[in-house]
Swiss-Prot record:
This is Transaldolase B. Belongs to the transaldolase family. Type 1 subfamily. GO terms for cellular component: cytosol. SUPFAM superfamilies: Aldolase (SSF51569).
Amino acid sequence: MTDKLTSLRQFTTVVADTGDIAAMKLYQPQDATTNPSLILNAAQIPEYRKLIDDAVAWAKQQSSDRAQQVVDATDKLAVNIGLEILKLVPGRISTEVDARLSYDTEASIAKAKRIIKLYNDAGISNDRILIKLASTWQGIRAAEQLEKEGINCNLTLLFSFAQARACAEAGVYLISPFVGRILDWYKANTDKKDYAPAEDPGVVSVTEIYEYYKQHGYETVVMGASFRNVGEILELAGCDRLTIAPALLKELAESEGAIERKLSFSGEVKARPERITEAEFLWQHHQDPMAVDKLADGIRKFAVDQEKLEKMIGDLL
């Protein structure tokens, strides 16, 4: 009998949400995603020490200014980890722009190009890299410009329909709507504590986005992210991609049985609406208190972990 991870792969591209190379070897995902929190965790793994030492040595060669060395070494470490992961996955690595730049379009573009250059200098072509940006208005505008220059983007921290619509209209390569963090908010802020998978507000959100994209012929890839349980994953079987943490990949791989495809589209493609304006985007996004809270919270948490990583690097310089 087949296991559920193998069964899921019939309908959905499975991506590993980790910086852990051992997990890549075990579960053989198509792609991998990282973020500042995952890079920070990966940096604690003894096998990665050589990657940190290389990043620090490289940064010292680039500048004599200590603050710049910290920035350079942190960028290089994220890329070094990405390079190791790319030895194990046939597809793409997602590497994230500093979350502190989430409201600065030009700085986000500059940082993205810096990351791309580090990969290119190591012999990796653009078609194996996704630049992760927060789905703020400014992040979406940065992605729109980068896409025009041949740099594909993964728009993350996506919680509202307004964010999803703006990303599609900007022509971004891929979005990462968060499932589990939406569920977390509803459990913390409403009286309802238990949800059947089909009623899970994160699952409902991704399903709505998937259907809207397919109905209007948008090519942007929908990659569900941030899962809290296997039930959420199984309810989104058929989504273009799902990025899954190692613990849940393990649970799927150890569970026997075929799974049913839940998401698909075979209807007629509708005309697209007029592009959303910045004012409309902000108004619609701010009508959803969950999305407002979780976007801000996500940016703050990634920024905190970025600063922890920089402190760790700084102590080695």
